[in-house]
From Swiss-Prot:
Single biological process term from Gene Ontology: translation
Protein name: Small ribosomal subunit protein uS15c
The keyword Plastid is assigned to this record: yes
SUPFAM superfamilies: S15/NS1 RNA-binding domain (SSF47060)
Family: Belongs to the universal ribosomal protein uS15 family.
Keyword ATP-binding attributed: no
HAMAP family: Ribosomal_uS15_B (MF_01343_B)
Lineage of producing organism: Eukaryota, Viridiplantae, Streptophyta, Embryophyta, Tracheophyta
Length: 90
C-alpha cells in the first residue's frame, strides 16, 4: 500500500502552524477517507473500518457545512481542489 499517494498539494506552501484551520482538517479527513476506501475495496467485510469511515465522513460533512456558512468562496475553492461533491442542502 502506498502511504503518501494522497498528499495534499494545497497545503504544501503553508506553514504547519495552521493545522487547526477548517481547510487543513477537511484535507486530512479526505486523505483518510481515500485510504480507507481503497482498504475497503480489498477487505469488504471489515465492518469496523466501515464504521470508522462513516464517522470520518460525518465529521468532514459537518466541517464543510460550517465552512459553507462562514465563507462560501473558500468552500467552493476547497471542494474544487479536492474534487469532492458539494453537500446537499436540506
Amino acid at each position: 500500500m502506498i502511504k503518501n499517494s494522497f498528499s495534499a498539494i494545497f497545503f504544501k506552501e503553508e506553514n504547519e502552524d495552521n493545522k487547526g484551520s477548517v481547510e487543513f482538517q477537511v484535507v486530512s479527513f479526505t486523505n483518510r477517507i481515500r485510504k480507507l476506501t481503497s482498504h475497503l475495496e480489498l477487505h469488504k467485510k471489515d465492518y469496523l473500518s466501515q464504521r470508522g469511515l462513516r464517522k470520518i465522513l460525518g465529521k468532514r460533512q459537518r466541517l464543510l457545512a460550517y465552512l459553507s456558512k462562514k465563507n462560501r468562496v473558500r468552500y467552493k475553492e476547497l471542494i474544487g481542489q479536492l474534487e469532492i461533491r458539494e453537500t446537499k442542502k436540506n
